Amino acid sequence: KKDGYPVEGDNCAFACFGYDNAYCDKLCKDKKADDGYCVWSPDCYCYGLPEHILKEPTKTSGRC
């Protein structure tokens, strides 16, 4: 498993304006992660993304 910022098609992390932890948690769990939250960036950060399920890349820092 890996942790990181899941990215959209434009290689930018998913924004979570308003620090919406529920949005990020759902987004991450939909990607089969253990959980997720909104960090100060503000972007969604996921914990426990399975390597074999995650098709798109993740970033370890930064929005784009």
UniProtKB/Swiss-Prot annotation:
<dbReference type="GO" id="GO:0090729">
    <property type="term" value="F:toxin activity"/>
</dbReference>
<keyword id="KW-0800">Toxin</keyword>
<dbReference type="GO" id="GO:0019871">
    <property type="term" value="F:sodium channel inhibitor activity"/>
</dbReference>
<keyword id="KW-1015">Disulfide bond</keyword>
<dbReference type="InterPro" id="IPR003614">
    <property type="entry name" value="Scorpion_toxin-like"/>
</dbReference>
<keyword id="KW-0964">Secreted</keyword>
<feature type="disulfide bond">
    <location>
        <begin position="12"/>
        <end position="64"/>
    </location>
</feature>
<dbReference type="Pfam" id="PF00537">
    <property type="entry name" value="Toxin_3"/>
</dbReference>
<protein>
    <recommendedName>
        <fullName>Alpha-toxin Ts5</fullName>
    </recommendedName>
</protein>
<feature type="domain" description="LCN-type CS-alpha/beta">
    <location>
        <begin position="2"/>
        <end position="64"/>
    </location>
</feature>
<feature type="disulfide bond">
    <location>
        <begin position="16"/>
        <end position="38"/>
    </location>
</feature>
<feature type="disulfide bond">
    <location>
        <begin position="24"/>
        <end position="44"/>
    </location>
</feature>
<dbReference type="InterPro" id="IPR044062">
    <property type="entry name" value="LCN-type_CS_alpha_beta_dom"/>
</dbReference>
<dbReference type="GO" id="GO:0005576">
    <property type="term" value="C:extracellular region"/>
</dbReference>
<feature type="disulfide bond">
    <location>
        <begin position="28"/>
        <end position="46"/>
    </location>
</feature>
<keyword id="KW-0528">Neurotoxin</keyword>
<keyword id="KW-0738">Voltage-gated sodium channel impairing toxin</keyword>
<comment type="function">
    <text>Alpha toxins bind voltage-independently at site-3 of sodium channels (Nav) and inhibit the inactivation of the activated channels, thereby blocking neuronal transmission. By extending the depolarized period it indirectly affects beta-cell voltage-dependent potassium channels, thus increasing potassium permeability.</text>
</comment>
<dbReference type="InterPro" id="IPR002061">
    <property type="entry name" value="Scorpion_toxinL/defensin"/>
</dbReference>
<comment type="similarity">
    <text>Belongs to the long (4 C-C) scorpion toxin superfamily. Sodium channel inhibitor family. Alpha subfamily.</text>
</comment>
<dbReference type="InterPro" id="IPR036574">
    <property type="entry name" value="Scorpion_toxin-like_sf"/>
</dbReference>
<keyword id="KW-0872">Ion channel impairing toxin</keyword>
<dbReference type="GO" id="GO:0006952">
    <property type="term" value="P:defense response"/>
</dbReference>
<dbReference type="InterPro" id="IPR018218">
    <property type="entry name" value="Scorpion_toxinL"/>
</dbReference>
